[in-house]
């Protein structure tokens, strides 16, 4: 319980510098959040096996969807899909690569990506799209959490590499990673995409959750 709690605290600390603005009075066609908050009117999901992307819409208004490999690369000249009203819609995007989308209606626009990544690791989630009390959003594709990275397939690693993932912080103990207890606990080393340049070990043991060493590591930002 303490371990899970601390993981959340660390992730929120790291997220403090990755917010983007949402200006309610911004009427320009920009790549980002603007106008009315419509972030809850649509969502992206991907099939875990095929990695096929689907858009789910929960608004009766006409809408447009634009796509790019990152928020900065979204092509606003040509929508990848348009519609009028609610429904689920298959997306013609590369199944092997991550995409970020901009969903737009007459009322506003919002960035979208799949919350639960289509990989074999349990509960691998993007923490992007979360709105804070100041009306700003965590950037998609900048901060993730997962319970494990030792069961990744080659397809999973290729997909994760397309996110540009660079830093991984492992909270597990040496025994959890290397195995122990006379073989009762098998070794479970992480499988990391080629883009990762900064792997960190930050062991969380019972009793050291709020130790000076842990707090100091967090304060330095692990970068």
Model-inferred region functions:
Residues 11-14:
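Outer/extracellular conduits and scaffolds centered on Gram-negative outer-membrane beta-barrels
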Residues 18-21:
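C-terminal motif of bacterial Sec signal peptides marking the signal peptidase cleavage site
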Residues 23-223:
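Cys-dependent protein tyrosine phosphatase-like superfamily
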